[in-house]
Design a protein with these regions (language model features):
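Conserved catalytic core of the tyrosine transesterase superfamily
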Residues: 1-324
Length: 324
């Protein structure tokens, strides 16, 4: 079964173009299922003998370990994807996980930052032209700050370009870090994005993102010029050593700027994607067009964003209408 799991992980990574987190999570979930199928000192139950009753026993086993419903639901989703892959590769004839219902989860509608909040945050991002004091360090009991190195002074230009692009295009973080130079049509301000399932879409970006990118290109050239070894000459967003930036690094960078802003904003890359869709919807954009821009396979996925918009409209109505 281990070889099948390795092939499944390769399928997620290279065919589904899944994010590193999804690959790690789903791989871990399936390995946990393999552990469940293997009694102490015994042999693993063959996949061909796994039916929906075994899947239900696994779900009960997860609950016995005090796992939350949302975690159980994700592991069940991983098994559905795994067995779908197994059917395709003819390791099994059916998908037993498809016959087991997902635990009912509370429908939580996330708060989406207003356009004003996002604009204030973006306007407050450093441009990277001036040297900045870096976090304090203690030496001999004294707190001291240090000046940023020449390369560190330039990193805010990269960071601003990334964050502007996340909001301008509604990108997934995996799509952002996967961008290559060939993804851009600079003259037309269009971006070719490789999304989930290796599906390609074209997304426009606006003037502010364009300005941020134009400020970043010389920084990128400098990183490549000073890099040791063989840098990634195709990747758009680079770390200081010339390698492709990771999605984990993007999350850290965004969190850092939220802390520097001193506001109550708790932004994640997906927060900007959600805000992108909600703000377009609030300004009258067609839901089908938003679906295309986000790269959603199903309109029902895009419709989740309407729930937040309706709640915001109701709040305005309740506050403003004399008979509310």
């Amino acid at each position: 079964m281990n070889k099948i799991i390795e092939k499944f992980i390769g399928y997620l990574r290279y065919e589904r173009n899944a994010s590193p987190e999804t690959v790690d999570d789903y791989g871990g979930d399936v390995r946990l299922f393999e552990q469940f199928l293997t009694p102490p000192g015994g042999a693993t139950l063959p996949l061909a003998e796994v039916d929906h009753r075994v899947i239900r026993e696994f779900v009960s086993w997860l609950y016995d370990r005090n796992l939350q419903k949302v975690t159980v639901a994700r592991k069940l989703s991983a098994l559905r994807t795994f067995f779908k892959f197994c059917v395709r590769e003819k390791y099994t004839r059916t998908n037993p996980a498809a016959l087991v219902s997902t635990p009912k989860l509370p429908k939580l509608v996330p708060r989406v930052q207003t356009a004003e909040e996002i604009n204030d945050f973006l306007d407050g991002l450093p441009g990277g032209a001036a040297a900045r004091a870096l976090p304090a360090r203690k030496k001999n009991g004294r707190t001291r700050t240090r000046r940023a190195t020449a390369k560190e002074q330039l990193m805010p230009r990269r960071d601003r370009a990334m964050i502007e692009l996340l909001y301008a295009c509604g990108l997934r973080v995996s799509e952002l870090v996967g961008l290559n130079l060939g993804s851009f049509d600079r003259a037309g301000q269009m971006l070719r994005v490789l999304g989930k399932g290796r599906k390609e879409r074209v997304v426009p970006y606006g003037g502010k993102a364009q300005q941020a990118l134009e400020a970043y290109w010389p920084v990128r050239d400098r990183i490549l010029g000073e890099a040791h070894g063989t840098p990634n000459a195709e990747a758009v967003f680079l770390n200081p050593l010339g390698g492709r930036l990771t999605d984990r690094a993007v999350r850290y960078i965004l969190k850092k700027y939220c802390l520097l802003a001193g506001s109550n904003l708790d932004l994640h890359p997906h927060s900007l994607r959600h805000a992108f869709a909600t703000h377009l919807l609030n300004d009258g954009a067609d839901l089908r067009a938003i679906q295309e821009l986000l790269g959603h396979a199903s309109l029902s996925t895009t419709q989740r964003y309407t729930q937040t918009s309706i709640r915001q409209l109701m709040a305005v109505y309740d506050k403003s209408h004399p008979h509310a």
